[in-house]
Amino acid sequence: MDNPTDTAGKCPVAHGNKPRGPSNRDWWPNQLNVQILHHNSGRADPMGKDFDYAEEFKKLDLDALKKDLTALMTDSQDWWPADFGHYGGLFIRMAWHSAGTYRITDGRGGAGQGQQRFAPLNSWPDNANLDKARRLLWPIKQKYGNRISWADLLILTGNVALESMGFKTFGFAGGRADVWEPEELYWGPEGTWLGDERYSGERQLAEPLGAVQMGLIYVNPEGPGGNPDPLASARDIRETFARMAMNDEETVALIAGGHTFGKTHGAGDPSFIGAEPEGGAIEDQGLGWKSSFGSGVGKDAITAGLEVTWSQTPTKWSNYFFENLFAYEWELTKSPAGAHQWQAKNAEASIPDAYEAGKKHLPTMLTSDLALRFDPIYEKISRRFLENPDQFADAFARAWFKLTHRDMGPKVRYLGPEVPAEDLIWQDVIPAVDHPLVGDKDIAELKAKVLATGLSVQELVSTAWASASTFRGSDKRGGANGARIRLAPQKDWDANQPAQLAKVLGVLEGLQKDFNAAQTGGKKISLADMIVLAGAAGVEKAAAAGGTTVSVPFTPGRMDASEAQTDAHSFAALEPRIDGFRNYVNDKRLQFMKPEEALVDRAQLLTLTGPEMTVLVGGLRVLKAGQPEHGVFTARPETLTNDFFVNLLDMATQWVPAAGKDGVYEGRDRKTGAAKWTGTRVDLIFGSHSQLRAFAEVYGQADAKEKFVKDFVAAWNKVMNADRFDLV
């Protein structure tokens, strides 16, 4: 994969949009950013609120589109000629880099929104000249219009590129709806392209980051920091691919499969390259990296500064990557641009030139390629693939499908005729509903039975919240559907209070078993539904205790996943380090955010707005959900009231840091000094941060009691149903 070094040292922050004064973030750089809760809210969407992409996709003639894409592969354009007469390598890189930003730590990145069109990704050094790939696609996107999103088109084009060169892919699913503004995502602390201040200690990569340098997708192909050491490169590869949820076999298959096609570009010194798209002149119309070296294109193209072609047939699927990797000894050399790369010793020139027929070159490799030979674990896998090409092809097909679909969530979101029938464990499989569901009468009776068990409001609400709040809108993982809270690892997470959780689940499983046994006609309720229903019963009881009658919506249809359908290792990434909604901090885990930052981060993953986050925190506090030691600003715990906001905003209370307790504060009577409450940074941020205080004041008003309950129930229901893609 190309990744240019020509922009090293340049600041990735845009300047020059004047007249412009300092922003609030310029004045107060440590101010909590709640604006991320309101990005892509719809105001920037030109399609309107009634546009249904899934319905538009159903109108798509996929065969006709793929035929047009196949024709494009060999329709070389003078303004950006195709290497070897085929754009396949370019489009594979485009699709790979669209998906390859995915990181398992928080589920962000990936291909699901078409973010490669926007800054900063469209101007990352590692994405150099992919603007040309997207411009080549524009006539096709223009032709098919709303029936295919950019997000889907980028991935489909990668698939068609592979198929047009003789590779059998595993499948393709549509369903990635475009967004219309860049997401504000933490890509690293560096202020310059290719900076690597993200490391500490013995090359410890900071979380949640998944790449080694600012502006790269994974690793530096020249080696760590440009050091051409294959074993050191292997360590970086293993770390970065693991953070994208890939194991060693998938990693080897992806690198070798991707590098079976195309070439890198390093015809001349990177100093010949102009600005990236976001920094270019207006007349360049969003095309960047204009080169003044020779013609600037084709044989004169500069992208990564590396000049490597891996295969004797770079437009055809083969096993040449592994054959070449093990056939030769390799000596370090430099590209015409001065980048470290490797050349085969005592070899014949067998690699075709991309533009001059009959011209041949010596086999070449990247430092990151040699890692697959010299790392002992990778070497074992690589030799197996060398000797078993069918295994390699199958592994690459599966790994490519995983790479390009990892952030799409459950299969119910997949669209189109090429969706594979096989269930894959990384898809977090949930069984299809195979029985009649409970009706309104059943729901009312079950709620009454739940309340008759003696389980407290706190226990019911905490369990339902723990089950549902794992949802991540980023990669559509987690949530209450599947009832995986009863399975490892979730049942043992400290944030879920395992002893209490086991007690509550035991009671609810008993009710579920008794109900199902008493039914005729096959009607059942799943434990996943039972957990959410019990939480609804708890909220209703708490609201009634506060003088408000409310019916919490409940829609059955969740199912229970099995251990065999659950990748426990993969689910470990969903464990909360900090959960501001539950006032929980795991002191045993390394934290990379302040508690209040983690609250907003979690709210964004739950797709909540600022007001929704605010009302949920206030409600969960008085219901004693989660860790009830702090923030319960009420004399009526387990009663759904707006007391949290009333008491937080009370000027009769003065807040001071608690002695010997970092991040904990005491609320004291301003006159007497008597202790009244204890709270955390997450609690106090709703009185400190001006925008959050404005939300809190709405719910702390004398006329807000009913609004508070109504809004809490609506936000609660949103979280409980966040993963119910079957309802969309």
Swiss-Prot record:
Gene Ontology cellular component annotations, sorted alphabetically: cytosol
Keyword Oxidoreductase: yes
GO biological process, one term: hydrogen peroxide catabolic process
PROSITE patterns attached to this UniProt entry: PEROXIDASE_1 (PS00435), PEROXIDASE_2 (PS00436), PEROXIDASE_4 (PS50873)
Residue ranges of the region described as Disordered: 1-26
Cross-link (Tryptophyl-tyrosyl-methioninium (Tyr-Met) (with W-96)): 218-244
Catalytic activity: H2O2 + AH2 = A + 2 H2O; 2 H2O2 = O2 + 2 H2O
Superkingdom of this protein's organism: Bacteria
Catalytic site: 97
UniProt function note: Bifunctional enzyme with both catalase and broad-spectrum peroxidase activity.
Record HAMAP family: Catal_peroxid
Subunit annotation: Homodimer or homotetramer.
Protein known as: Catalase-peroxidase
Organism the protein comes from: Rhizobium etli (strain CIAT 652)
Gene that produces this protein: katG
